[in-house]
Amino acid sequence: MPDIEYDNFLKVTLFKLSSEFRRLDTDERAKAKKEFVEVVDTHSERDEIRTYSTVGTRADADFMIVQDSASVDTFHEAAKAINHSLLGRYLDQSHSYLSIRRKSRYKHGGGSPKLKEDYKYMVIYPMTKTRPWYEKSMKERQEMMNDHFRVGKNYPMVKINTSYAFGLDDTEFVLSFEMDDPSEFTSLVM
């Protein structure tokens, strides 16, 4: 078995609020939101949890929760608490990605892949490499990755995190890009 250095697990979940929630009176909505914040805060004591609004950017999601943990079990505990909350009654999970960080097989001078900074925006990019990628030699793949690393170094304002997906979906990797200005991300990838 290869000697692979594993790190924390990453869970990205996108939620859509049902229209019924918007029809609740102001006090009921406030009560549900307050309880939801308490649930997230409780689970943030052990693991890093970040929330991002996607309102106005995605039709199928209103917000995203990104969890970083040493144990997959904590994701289950948090999901159970969210589902049993008042707000949970009005939430549909539109997307979910489960992955683990590990040291890349490709050599580069990058830093730690942990979520450390508190950036304003996060772009999640689930991806799968195609068969032609794996038909290339390791040397060819390393050269292509070196090109990616060179480009990435020109955009230090974008923090890039790579994690390796597993689960029931077809995603192979979950890339996350953190930044304070979304135009920085588009400059990086264009």
Describe the residue ranges of each PLM region.
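Short hydrophobic/aromatic beta-strand micro-patches
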Residues: 14-16, 66-68, 176-178
